[in-house]
């Protein structure tokens, strides 16, 4: 008999895949919550049955977005603890409690991390700063919001972030806190860099050498910031650091549907020898980044390997906890 997976797991997976749930932190918390619901609603009669359900649920969630490492790191956080309990001979209710509690713990730590990043990062923002940001990052927003709450007179330049327009979400959120916002097209980033004091952006993944994988366009903004000698600050929780890159694995860049760029009706009328490429992310080299702000403090990009060893060193010794 196959594992009975609750509908919330499939719904969450679909929302992550379609980008209804977007942003590395929200994706991670949604994945942890889906595992929690699976454990809560499971009709399993034996520990092995629940363990198998959680493994299948993890695989369904894992296969949704290849680039956002926050997703597998959330699954690892929960499943590593559940696996230890299962192999230790836990009974059904203990196993269920371990899954639910681990998921709640991850979600709590994730939300607290954003607050802490805001507190740490705001110390690097000065009164009168004009800040440029890209896409929609809760961690990056936390830095700007905290600085504004401290009474610093800041203004934020927000790029539209084509083709999914995440910049609109960022602009409206910052404005709701009372922060003055300038909204620009992506291609105007270099034009307005000369009036920018600092760049603050988020990350989907951070590699062992300190490179940042984030929304397409991030590397161009970081490059033009370097050209103008403008500080680039990346705000990211430690669960966005990519453990597999310690072993040389390359991060897969997700290619999304062309209809996100050109509406399907219009695309049908285009000549067949035009291809529309739509990468969701790009890679910003560590030399274009000045600091990475984490909940554990501010580090230079080359110190990313130290965070990875401390946080995920155990992951190098084992296969994924949901693998057979």
Curated annotation (Swiss-Prot):
SUPFAM superfamilies, per database record: NagB/RpiA/CoA transferase-like
Keyword check for Cell inner membrane: no
Residues the record marks as active site: 135, 204
InterPro entries: IF-2B-related, IF_2B-like_C, Initiation_fac_2B_a/b/d, M1Pi_N, NagB/RpiA_transferase-like, R15Pi
Alphabetized HAMAP family for the sequence: R15P_isomerase
Domain of life: Archaea
Protein name: Ribose 1,5-bisphosphate isomerase
Record-listed substrate binding positions: 22-25, 65, 137-139, 214-215, 240
Annotated source species: Pyrococcus horikoshii (strain ATCC 700860 / DSM 12428 / JCM 9974 / NBRC 100139 / OT-3)
Paired cysteines (S-S): none
Family: Belongs to the eIF-2B alpha/beta/delta subunits family. R15P isomerase subfamily.
Keyword terms of this UniProt record: Carbohydrate metabolism, Isomerase
Misc. remarks from the entry: Reaction proceeds via a cis-phosphoenolate intermediate.
GO MF annotation terms: ribose 1,5-bisphosphate isomerase activity; S-methyl-5-thioribose-1-phosphate isomerase activity
